[in-house]
């Protein structure tokens, strides 16, 4: 909890009148460690100043990673009714990572990766489109994918959704990635990332929070991701956290 980045900041915050010579001479720690813990801050006579300093620092954002499939009903429900709405309301305290792959299988033939998806070839195409969008559009891809997954037909919605949220990006540029070596490589990276999960995923949507997956975190995320993010954020809670957003989405595609 206690910690800081720059000694210069401490010099500015802690005036000589507050940090008396008596404390400075009795402190065996360098200034770079004064706010590293309450005990050290107290020993060096700067506890009050460290409390004030740390209270002004922005806490780390809560990172939510979603391992999913483009045509899995449970994945679509969680992404559209929980993940993206929560991100919109809590974007100052959370970040997300989308990994389209899920329960797919990967083999290699003639120097290329071949993917077999749980919900057929259409899902493999959807996964690849969303992967290429994430690579090309960055965070802007989230709303395009939200639009796709909200539609009756994910694949038919892809091009119109891109036109709505990123009209400056051509559909041809996305499909060039999808059909080329770049898309194949990116999907392989998703496969490696998914297969490296610890514990291994057993179903999708599979959710990790700050890199961790437990049954309890999964249940809380599926029950109310909004409440979970608010509860885990260690900084000052945004006003939105007092409102609440609850929608249970316990629907899975088993591995």
From Swiss-Prot:
What is stated about pH in the biophysicochemical properties? Optimum pH is 4-5.
A Pfam match: GILT
Q: Which cysteines are joined by disulfide bonds?
A: 72-75
E.C. designation(s): 1.8.-.-
> Looking at the keywords, is Disulfide bond present?
yes
UniProt entry keywords in alphabetical sequence: Disulfide bond, Glycoprotein, Immunity, Lysosome, Oxidoreductase, Redox-active center, Secreted, Signal
In the UniProt record, which is one GO cellular component term?
Answer: lysosome
Q: Which residues form the signal peptide?
A: 1-21
Task: Spell out the subcellular localization from the entry.
Answer: Secreted; Lysosome
Organs and tissues of expression: Strongly expressed in spleen and kidney. Also detected at lower levels in heart, liver, intestine and muscle.
A single Gene Ontology biological process assigned to it is: immune system process
Q: What does this protein do?
A: Lysosomal thiol reductase that can reduce protein disulfide bonds. May facilitate the complete unfolding of proteins destined for lysosomal degradation. Plays an important role in antigen processing.
Q: How does it assemble?
A: Dimer; disulfide-linked.
Q: Name it.
A: Gamma-interferon-inducible lysosomal thiol reductase
Species name: Danio rerio
Name of the gene this protein is made from: ifi30
């Amino acid at each position: 909890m206690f910690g800081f980045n720059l000694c210069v900041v401490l010099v500015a915050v802690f005036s000589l009148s507050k940090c008396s010579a008596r404390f400075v001479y009795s402190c065996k720690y360098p200034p770079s460690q004064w706010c590293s813990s309450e005990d050290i801050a107290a020993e060096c006579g700067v506890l009050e100043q460290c409390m004030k300093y740390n209270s002004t620092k922005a806490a780390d954002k809560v990172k939510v990673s979603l391992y999913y499939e483009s045509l899995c009903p449970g994945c679509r429900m969680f992404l559209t009714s929980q993940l993206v709405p929560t991100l919109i309301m809590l974007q100052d305290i959370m970040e997300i990572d989308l990994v389209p792959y899920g329960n797919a299988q990967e083999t290699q033939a003639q120097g290329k990766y071949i993917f077999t998806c749980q919900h057929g070839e259409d899902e493999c195409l959807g996964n690849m489109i969303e992967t290429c969008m994430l690579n090309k559009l960055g965070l802007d891809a989230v709303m395009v994918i939200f639009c796709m997954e909200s539609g009756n037909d994910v694949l038919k919605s892809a091009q119109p959704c891109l036109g709505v949220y990123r009209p400056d990006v051509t559909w041809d540029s996305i499909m060039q990635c999808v059909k080329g070596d770049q898309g194949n490589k990116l999907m392989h990276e998703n496969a490696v990332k998914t297969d490296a999960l610890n514990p291994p995923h057993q179903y999708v949507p599979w959710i990790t929070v700050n890199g961790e997956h437990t049954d309890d975190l999964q249940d809380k995320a599926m029950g109310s991701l909004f409440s979970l993010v608010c509860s885990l954020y260690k900084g000052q809670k945004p006003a939105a956290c007092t409102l609440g957003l609850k929608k249970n989405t316990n629907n899975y595609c088993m591995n």
